Amino acid sequence: MVTCRSLLVVIGLAVLTGCSGVSNGPNGGSPPAEPTPDTISGTVTFNGQPLAGVTVTDFMTNTNTVYQTAVTDAHGKYTFTGMKVTGNVPGDYQVYVNKSGYGFYPSVGNGAQARRFDYTGQFLNTGGLPPSGIFFNVIDYLALPDSPLTGANFAAYDGTNAPVTLAATGQQVSYAAGDDASVHKGAAWSAATRFTDNQNGTVTDSLTGLVWLQDAGCLGSALWAAGLTAANQLASGACGLSDGSTAGQWRMPNVGELESLVDVSASNPALPASAPFQNVSGGVYWTSTSYYGGVSGSSAAWTIRLSDGRYMNDTSSNLKATASNVLWAVKGAGGGTIKLQATGFYVPYAAGDDGNLQAGVPLIFPRFVDHGDGTLTDTVTGLIWLKQADCIHGQWPDALAAVNSLASGQCGLSDGSSAGQWRMPNRNELQSLADRAQTNLAEYFDYTYRNKDNSVFQSPIFTNYIETQYYWTSTTDAADPTEAWTVYSCDFGVYDIAKTSAGYTLAVR
């Protein structure tokens, strides 16, 4: 697969002013006035308050050079001046921010949109292009005559104001000290009260706020493209619906949305037993999230087997053109107890797919704050992770015990933590690290990204995140308690393997 170098952008496209119609020939008339150089201005805030001392970079993509830099003042404000049109070519300027200890997400008040965008130029260095994509938040502005950009703002995050709260997995039975059910991390929910039958062919999930088609088998099986179309065209009057919905309101769920239904305490199907769904198959269900394949397209999409909640990764289950999988439909944009994070996928391959809709809380950049003591904070979820990713390795029971006894002085830690404060991540926690625009997350986590002058732009996030390896979660496979759920280090798919197998583990608190 093709790796990508991408970033999240807000594109501000100004409109050219009208011509004056004045003659510029020898018979008279005034020559056109030189266009006023454009300006870019905005504010950086943290929890709604101005954040001073943030370095703001104005990068010109036409020349792949830093055009100018600024530092936010006591009011969190910055201004750039002098953006011009050169000849008939508008200057393309990308603004991004950095301050140690924070991640950022952009917004702009003039109608521009936040979205991810392919970008390679800044990371051309003596080693060539990075092996994996890097995604960071910028405001992209085309400098057209007399069109200043205002309200080019950034919100800062440090983990204490994390926008995402993870849900509990639903595991009820404990199989070992320190496992998922014994620790019970995540937003609690009750299967008996979580779902509401709306008596109109829909079911509302109060945990996520999503509204699901009650008849999970009505749309049947289809190839991926046909499934997307069927979901997009679903409307009241079909599949038992009397909700007044119209075509375009329903969609195929992305991988995070479908995963949110999985109850790891159940099997056949792996859904809460009291959920009022009908005709749920134990087979393989499509998601609208593709494997990243570059801007030209991808031949495969993520699928989940609902008999047990396993992600599928084989040609018979994932190829869009040949695999016939079951389709479910969802609508709504949240409003529940928790907010689901976006998958990170951003390339639109088809109408209604994940790349088009990008549903969920967007990912922040830089996402992780390195505390210099062997720990990292994820600004999206607020979780604190062990930085050294290869320190704990073994069978599931031994890995659990090692994490339970982990303390400062071990595995590169100098944080003052003591035994009992760390835990093995559950299925939802480990999976939350995923960014579905990456084809090899372990590679991305380990890589040093350098600017053209070979200076470091981003140091490795984790230390020695091992490629092509299974990383344990504390969550047991309810369909076979001799197995536990793992997350594969490259694709971040969720797979069950025997607890007697050897695997790596991260630690979290």
Residue ranges and their predicted role:
Residues N88-F123:
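A short, solvent-exposed loop/turn motif at the edges and junctions
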Residues N62-M83:
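Short, acidic Ser/Thr/Gly-rich low-complexity loop/linker segments typical of extracellular
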Residues V15-G18:
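C-terminal motif of bacterial Sec signal peptides marking the signal peptidase cleavage site
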Residues S20-T39, T45-Q49:
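Beta-strand-rich domain onsets/edges
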Residues D38-I40, F46-T63, D73:
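Short, ordered, surface-exposed loop/turn motifs in non-cytosolic proteins
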Residues G28-P31, G111-A143:
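Extracellular beta-sheet/turn segments enriched in Thr/Pro/Gly and aliphatic residues
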Residues M1-L8:
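Bacterial N-terminal signal peptides that target proteins for export
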Residues S20-S30, G133-R251, V255-R423, R427-R509:
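Glycine-aromatic-enriched surface loops/turns that form tight recognition elements
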